Amino acid sequence: MSSSETPRFGSIIWTDLTIPNAEELRDFYAGVAGWTAAPVRMGTYADYQMNAPATGESVAGICHARGVNAGLPPQWLMYISVEDIIRSAARCTELGGTILVPPRPMGSYGTFCVIRDPAGAVAALFQPAKTSS
């Protein structure tokens, strides 16, 4: 998702695959889905933005389980856009969920956290950065 897009609150806006070896599965999904990869520098390593073959549109991320993703199990992680991440994280715990990664910045894009719902499924909440008009 680019920083110029304004996501609709409550929508699934992105998905990342978080795994120990991003290069291995980058190549797997490039072969299976025809995606092309664009590296995203993360300091000493790169994660990957995966793009659709026909349009070049960004469709997913393939990320190392390091940095902000350290400690996450291998999984596809969907991001749900919320208006107020602090309020949504509080509601998560009030309703029986768990905060796995507390709210933290995601570069200039906004703020995210990772939650586990009462059934054990994991998702991320994302509050986009405020843009000046």
Label each PLM-derived region with a short phrase.
Residues 6-9, 13-57, 94:
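Core segments of cupin and vicinal oxygen chelate
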Residues 42-43, 105-106, 133:
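Residue-level "edge-of-site" marker
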Residues 21-23, 54-55, 78-119:
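Vicinal oxygen chelate
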Residues 1-26, 75-80, 126-133:
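N-terminal beta-strand motif that seeds the catalytic metal site of vicinal oxygen chelate
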